[in-house]
Regions:
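Contiguous beta-strand/loop segments that form the cofactor/metal-binding neighborhood of enzyme cores
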Residues: 143-216, 243-254
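C-terminal helix-rich "cap/oligomerization" subdomain common to oxidoreductases
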Residues: 5, 27-32, 178, 230, ...
Length: 259
């Protein structure tokens, strides 16, 4: 109650069930650990609530497929709070690629690493909390790749270094789709890396730093060597962009749904 009073929160619930069944609630934002998403999402859908859920949306495709079907049956929208799909810079870069100035996308390279102290009880390294590099940070890289590839990858090679708990502490991925576009990903929870994404094309390349919440990118053209800096949006407004897209998706704009 003290927290609610401090931040002027008008309604407080004594249980999750009380919130899920409240007829005045239209949308629920789920921000709990990964391993709880499926259960909470299912409960929300059955109570006719639209859902925005933090990444990773579920632990596997079977869970997600079931929930998508259930959402369609109950006429509700589910969306993943994956910043890559909602930050304005990505739509702007997509327009540049669609213009043809850079030519075909050939290769995408991704890095994301943070140094987490070995604490086997926290969510990063705890199997019971769906820990590991892929579910925590790898989903950003894969979403970036999917945004810029012409089709989803259908070939995958991977190498994993496990943490003492068995979750993936480090991972390397090599992906390719039917168009021959390739992508490489290096992830780590125990080694700091820059959050860098690069899209290499026939006539130049795009480089994006801090790509999970990017607001700026550089576009370099091979023939002239010129580099153009592109800006759009603000880092601190990332959640607002997600909410705006969620509202538009509920209103019927399917282009704002990225599942």
């Amino acid at each position: 109650m003290a927290f609610a009073e401090k931040y002027n929160i008008g309604k407080v619930y004594d249980s999750y069930d009380e919130m899920f069944t409240d007829p005045d609630v239209d949308i629920i934002y789920i921000t709990t650990p990964h391993n709880t998403h499926y259960g909470f999402m299912k409960k929300a859908i059955l109570n006719k609530k639209h859902i925005l859920v933090e990444k990773s949306i579920t632990l596997n495709s079977d869970e997600l497929g079931e929930l998508i079907a259930l959402a369609e049956e109950n006429n509700v929208v589910i969306g993943e709070a994956m910043t890559v799909y909602h930050m304005p810079i990505y739509s702007k870069l997509r327009e540049i690629l669609d213009s043809g100035k850079l030519g075909k996308v050939n290769l995408i390279t991704m890095n994301f690493g943070s140094f987490k102290e070995y604490d086997m009880n926290n969510r990063f390294f705890n199997r019971n909390l769906a820990g590991g590099a892929m579910l925590d940070i790898g989903v950003y890289a894969l979403s970036f790749i999917r945004w810029f590839m012409d089709s989803k990858p259908d070939q995958l090679l991977s190498q994993v270094k496990p943490a003492p708990t068995g979750v993936d502490e480090q991972a390397g991925l090599l992906l390719m789709n039917k168009e021959g576009q390739m992508a490489t990903v290096m992830l780590s929870l125990h080694s700091k890396q820059p959050k860098r994404g690069m899209v290499s094309c026939e006539n130049g390349y795009i480089e994006i730093m801090e790509y999970p919440r990017a607001w700026e990118a550089s576009v370099t053209y091979t023939e002239t060597g010129d580099t153009e800096v592109i800006t759009a949006g603000k880092n601190e407004d990332a959640l607002a962009y997600e909410l705006e897209d969620m509202e538009q998706a509920i209103a019927g704009d399917e282009s704002k749904m990225h599942l």
